[in-house]
Structures are given as structure tokens and as C-alpha cells.
């Protein structure tokens, strides 16, 4: 066929870099300061690794609960800085008027305003949709499977694969 593997990999990386930051999410608009529905967001973080188990980037995800669309994603460490970056990527209407459900991880409390934040235990089952999405992400993106032979060698490819899956997931959710 005449296509070299090096060119093909470069082409794929270029394609991953051009994926939209909005991830094809259809956020709720707040027109004329009137909200018709309550905005609910579930946020969570999950571990992954790049190249070796010691190199652990964390995947931070925020999901519009009623619509089941991933609205924000950040890959970084497990610090308050990463929580702030996830918060900054959430659409403005949700940051202003939404209720955010998270696990009881301490860094969320310093980032999300107290009036909007609900730190929930696993028994309350208010974060079951985001937990289910995390499982789906692990199943469908082979480099996130635990104890697997496939893994990312570069962080940019790791982020690109996650972003590609989320874009596809949101497009299928919007059509449903």
C-alpha cells in the first residue's frame, strides 16, 4: 500500500490534537437568567498510567447527570491544582447555577463553592453515573484497563485517546 507506519502514527497524533475542546457536549443555556431545570453535575477522578506504573496521571471528569454527557475532563496529578483546572473547564452556566456531587476527596472542598458542593459517600449513590462512566472508559479505552499489556508511552497520546472516546461518547449521547 505504500504507507509507512511512522507517517501513519504522525497522522493519527495530528488528528487527536485537532479534536475539539468542547468534546461535542451540548451544555444547557441560561437565557435571560431563567433556568427551567436544575443543573446537576457529578465529578470524579480515576487513576491511569503512562509508560510505567510509577507515572500516574489522574483523569478528572465532570458529567452532566441528567443528560449523561461528559462536559469537562482534565488529565493531571491528584492535587487541588488539577481540581481547579477541571472546575475551570466546566461550562459557566453549571459553575454559576449547578449542584456538583463528588466523592469525599478533600481537594474538591477548596475549589467548588460550598453552596453548590455535595460531598457524597458511596452509600448515597449520587455519583453512580460518573462511576459507571469510569468503568465504561476503562472497558473501551484499552490503555486504561488495569493489568493489561496495552498502555500509553506518551502523555499526549494518552490524553488524545481519552479525548477521542469522550467526543464519540458525547456524540452518541446527543443523538439518543
Write out the residue ranges for each language-model feature.
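Residue-level recognition of single "structural anchor" positions
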Residues: 1-176
Amino acid at each position: 500500500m505504500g504507507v509507512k507506519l511512522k507517517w501513519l502514527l504522525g497522522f493519527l497524533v495530528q488528528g487527536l490534537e485537532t479534536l475539539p475542546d468542547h468534546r461535542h457536549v451540548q451544555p444547557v443555556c441560561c437565557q435571560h437568567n431563567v433556568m427551567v431545570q436544575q443543573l446537576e453535575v457529578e465529578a470524579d477522578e480515576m487513576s491511569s498510567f503512562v509508560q510505567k506504573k510509577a507515572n500516574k496521571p489522574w483523569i478528572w471528569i465532570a458529567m452532566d447527570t441528567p443528560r449523561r454527557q461528559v462536559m469537562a475532563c482534565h488529565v493531571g496529578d491528584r492535587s487541588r491544582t488539577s481540581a481547579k483546572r477541571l472546575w475551570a473547564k466546566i461550562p459557566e452556566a453549571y459553575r454559576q447555577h449547578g449542584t456538583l456531587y463528588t466523592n469525599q476527596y478533600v481537594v474538591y472542598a477548596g475549589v467548588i463553592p460550598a453552596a453548590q458542593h455535595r460531598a457524597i459517600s458511596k452509600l448515597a449513590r449520587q455519583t453512580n453515573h460518573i462511576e459507571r462512566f469510569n468503568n465504561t472508559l476503562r472497558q473501551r479505552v484499552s490503555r486504561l484497563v488495569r493489568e493489561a499489556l496495552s498502555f500509553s508511552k506518551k502523555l499526549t497520546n494518552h490524553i488524545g485517546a481519552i479525548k477521542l472516546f469522550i467526543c464519540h461518547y458525547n456524540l452518541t449521547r446527543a443523538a439518543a
